[in-house]
């Protein structure tokens, strides 16, 4: 699981999502600090469009589970993108580069 404060970190988090697809799978949560504190983020049509465009840069095409979880008594959400490990379609690339996870670090595949 990877925490991101906002989709302002979308490019880097898509690299991590690509690594999840190439390894054991995983989930990225936007609107959550590194320490696990939920802060949420506002979700507009532009936010959803940016996420869709970023996900479409992952090749080969894969279906991901994207959820928008409302935070009570606010107008903010936690955005969850879940990737199942895809053993038979690897390697996955984002913007033409393949990624993998080593511990909690995302790095280029050799």
Model regions and ranges:
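Conserved N-terminal catalytic/coupling substructures associated with nucleotide/phosphate chemistry
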Residues: 1-110
């Amino acid at each position: 699981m990877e925490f991101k404060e906002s989709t302002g970190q979308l490019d880097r988090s898509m690299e991590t999502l690509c690594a999840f697809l190439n390894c054991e799978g995983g989930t990225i949560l936007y609107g959550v600090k590194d320490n696990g504190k939920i802060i949420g983020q506002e979700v507009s049509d532009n936010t959803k469009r940016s996420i869709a465009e970023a996900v479409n840069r992952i090749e080969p095409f894969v279906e991901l589970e994207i959820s928008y979880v409302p935070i009570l008594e606010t107008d903010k959400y936690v955005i969850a993108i879940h990737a199942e490990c895809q053993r038979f379609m690897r390697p996955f690339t984002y913007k033409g580069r393949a990624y993998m996870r080593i511990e909690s670090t995302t790095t280029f595949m050799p």
